[in-house]
């Protein structure tokens, strides 16, 4: 499950990178021959590199807006979408066949013996989750005000020195920005 931040919360660099990737994908739809695509991709990269070190944020924002308008005018009417990507013909087609994690608890010991490394690690993770779950829930309750959650900001992932919760990607955010 991928998290997609709303455009208002993206940094300028993230917006530029996403525009560049979208532009390359649409260019790929326009240029079906690989050599022609590569030539125009290099030209596009040069256009982006030209303003890479722009210090004036007003100018950089204006350039980004102009580039997005140019992209909007020149985008492909029927861009190629990969089948497993959102909007593709096979997107989430096989979700119904994915087996939940708890089903592995009911495997026969002879089946588990075929994957000893995986199941030994899995047992360690389950034990760790059972030991840390109550502590993590207590921590979240302590950090939440009595009036309830006042903002949409997610609680921190852990206190210093604690192990990361196993469900952090669902309910928490990292305490510090990763480097």
From Swiss-Prot:
Cellular component annotations (GO), alphabetically ordered: mitochondrial inner membrane; mitochondrion; respiratory chain complex I
Lipid bilayer topology: Peripheral membrane protein
The keyword Transport belongs to this UniProt entry's keyword annotation: yes
GO biological process entries: aerobic respiration; mitochondrial electron transport, NADH to ubiquinone; proton motive force-driven mitochondrial ATP synthesis
Annotated keywords: Acetylation, Electron transport, Membrane, Mitochondrion, Mitochondrion inner membrane, Phosphoprotein, Respiratory chain, Transport
Subunit structure: Mammalian complex I is composed of 45 different subunits.
Protein name as it appears in the record: NADH dehydrogenase [ubiquinone] 1 beta subcomplex subunit 9
Organism whose genome encodes this protein: Mus musculus
Lineage of origin: Eukaryota, Metazoa, Chordata, Craniata, Vertebrata
């Amino acid at each position: 499950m991928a998290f997609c931040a709303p455009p208002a919360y993206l940094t300028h660099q993230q917006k530029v990178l996403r525009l560049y990737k979208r532009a390359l994908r649409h260019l790929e739809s326009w240029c079906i021959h690989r050599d022609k695509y590569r030539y125009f991709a290099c030209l596009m990269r040069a256009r982006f590199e030209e303003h890479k070190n722009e210090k004036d944020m007003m100018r950089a924002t204006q350039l980004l807006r102009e580039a997005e308008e140019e992209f909007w005018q020149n985008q492909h009417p029927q861009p190629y979408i990969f089948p497993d990507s959102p909007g593709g013909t096979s997107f989430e087609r096989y979700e119904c066949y994915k087996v939940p994690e708890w089903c592995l608890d009911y495997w026969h010991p002879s089946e588990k013996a075929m994957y000893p490394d995986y199941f030994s690690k899995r047992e360690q993770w389950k034990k760790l989750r059972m030991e840390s779950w109550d502590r993590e829930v207590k921590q979240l309750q302590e950090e939440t005000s009595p009036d309830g959650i006042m903002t949409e900001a997610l609680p921190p992932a852990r206190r210093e020195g604690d192990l990361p919760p196993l469900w952090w990607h669902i309910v928490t955010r990292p305490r510090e920005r990763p480097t």
